[in-house]
Amino acid sequence: MTEPRAWFLAGTDTEIGKTFVACALLHAARRDGRSALGMKPVAAGAEWIAGEWLNEDAAQLRAASSFDPGLDRLNPYCLKTPVAPHIAAAEEGVEIDPARIRAAFESLRAQADVVIVEGVGGFRVPLGDRYDTADLARELGLPVILVVGMRLGCISHALLTVEAIAARGLTLAGWIANRIDPAMLRADENLEALRRRIDAPLLGVVPHVAGADPAQVAASLRLPG
């Protein structure tokens, strides 16, 4: 096994395709002959399936991983209600413990060449009264890959997120443009504006293809380095 490498995958917003991109990156790593595991530290919204509470994002990451490391490590906190995690956690009487997440992450990192840790929602989503996903990325000490959902308003969202990443002392390892809105006007011009303003490599552009599979899209992406 090569030296383990891991990244924190953040997004400019919710519903911009982070999980799809995370799965594609896992497939890209596996295509290059590396073992790869996905992780969703906190997920909100789950269904009772085959005797376990299962979040859809976590299920997709598990399917794209080289092997199943167990949901207790892949998704340490699976909250049932599809609302902001700190609200769901409070309603369910759950306190999100960063130490538990870190232990699960270290277990994954010891088992694979590549670990992709997917955040929840945008970059700064509360996980408790004084703890958010940006704090989690900093605590894990991971460089960040930013997924930009290409739609109207994405330039401001992306640049503000880039500033927030830098403000936390984190490294932006690269960014990925996800064409989530096929009707977006001047999409290429928006992409070029982002390319000129983000001081990090563009790791790929995910095309908008109905019914696309992450394994197919993997060819359009690369991991940093």
UniProtKB/Swiss-Prot annotation:
Keyword Iron: no
Keyword Metal-binding belongs to the record: yes
Gene Ontology terms: biological process: biotin biosynthetic process
Protein name: ATP-dependent dethiobiotin synthetase BioD
A GO cellular component entry from the record: cytosol
Residues binding ATP, per UniProt: 15-20, 57, 118-121, 178-179, 207-209
Subunit and interaction comment: Homodimer.
Domain of life assignment: Bacteria
EC main group: ligase
Recorded catalytic activity of this chain's protein: (7R,8S)-7,8-diammoniononanoate + CO2 + ATP = (4R,5S)-dethiobiotin + ADP + phosphate + 3 H(+)
Record's subcellular location: Cytoplasm
Pathway: Cofactor biosynthesis; biotin biosynthesis; biotin from 7,8-diaminononanoate: step 1/2
Binding site for Mg(2+): T19, D57, E118
Cofactor: Mg(2+)
Keywords noted in UniProt: ATP-binding, Biotin biosynthesis, Cytoplasm, Ligase, Magnesium, Metal-binding, Nucleotide-binding
Taxonomic source organism: Aromatoleum aromaticum (strain DSM 19018 / LMG 30748 / EbN1)
UniProt record similarity statement: Belongs to the dethiobiotin synthetase family.
Record's function text: Catalyzes a mechanistically unusual reaction, the ATP-dependent insertion of CO2 between the N7 and N8 nitrogen atoms of 7,8-diaminopelargonic acid (DAPA, also called 7,8-diammoniononanoate) to form a ureido ring.
Gene Ontology MF terms in the entry: ATP binding; dethiobiotin synthase activity; magnesium ion binding
Active site: K40
Pfam families tied to this protein: AAA_26
Entry EC no(s): 6.3.3.3
